[in-house]
From Swiss-Prot:
Pfam families: DHO_dh
Location (main, coarse): membrane
Natural source organism: Baumannia cicadellinicola subsp. Homalodisca coagulata
Quaternary data: Monomer.
Presence of the UniProt keyword Membrane in the record: yes
GO molecular function, a single term: dihydroorotate dehydrogenase (quinone) activity
Protein name as catalogued: Dihydroorotate dehydrogenase (quinone)
Role noted for this protein: Catalyzes the conversion of dihydroorotate to orotate with quinone as electron acceptor.
UniProt-annotated catalytic positions: S175
Cofactor annotation comment: Binds 1 FMN per subunit.
Endoplasmic reticulum as UniProt keyword: no
One cellular component (GO) term of this entry: plasma membrane
Pathway listed: Pyrimidine metabolism; UMP biosynthesis via de novo pathway; orotate from (S)-dihydroorotate (quinone route): step 1/1
Gene: pyrD
Catalysed reactions, as listed in the record: (S)-dihydroorotate + a quinone = orotate + a quinol
Amino acid sequence: MLYPLIRQFLFQLDPEKAHELTIQQLKRIAGTPLEYLVRQSVPTKAVTCMGIAFKNPLGLAAGLDKNGECIDALGAMGFGFIEVGTVTPHAQIGNEKPRLFRLTKAYGLINRMGFNNKGVDNLVNNIQKSHFGGVLGINIGKNKDTPIEQGKDDYLICMEKVYPYANYIAVNISSPNTPQLTTLQSGEILDDLLRAIKDKQAKLQEYHHKYVPIAVKITPDMTESELIQMADLLVQHKIDGIIATNTTTSRELVHGLDHSSQSGGLSGRPLQLMSTEVIRILSSKLQGKLPIIGVGGIDSLISAREKMAAGATLIQIYSSFIFHGPRLIKDIISDL
């Protein structure tokens, strides 16, 4: 494929400009003869998770297509599922720029985007226009200006609007780039949020006559005891799945590299071992009670197999997709 040449050009640009240009071009080619440039045939490796049939276990993680603008073009690349978002009730511009940095030598990224998105209504409108027939996950969050005490209301608003269009809903309570968001991951505030989400899910199931599973996306920056406490709560509330993990604020493996001192969440290869260990701990604790979607640093067949050996049923990529392009999807799935 042409991706090595495309990457060479894109990596001359500011990372966020390169991202915007990529989204624009993918949007432009969808449904045209030019879609053949990204379309590839991958083997079927069927798996069932959360009651959903996936054609293969490799998905695109949230964050790349926040507004659902290029679902069709991404779907042509062979992903087993696509997760769009994170989306919030109202549009927001996110944090100040620059807010996205490449750690090229480490095959990593640091972002402090801050849930920049055009709002849930815009996302729904884009989904309605798409022709993607695969599994679609929708990742939801809270607006920055919503007080943390009222944060659950934002999740419930988003749930109601995306429910008819989602195959599963991912609840993002682990981004390090929205003030206080990670406080939703423990104690009474988590208990309250999960109860409200499950109540809403039951009402929406009755109204729409379909059950849409809920998965919670967690941080890697928790102690083992915090992880176990969270797992207990997720099981107690009958949450359908857990996405492990989001980005890390740790810089242990990238110390001294260009941009490593930038604040935000670190993703890509430096996150690989950390996220795999979280999956291993969760898998040991959960004993199959809750499926795990593994994400963080998967950039090869070997690292994909490591995630699954640790206990993940499904896996996702994002940063490695930026570095290696669509060919990585085929390389992983073909021998997984």
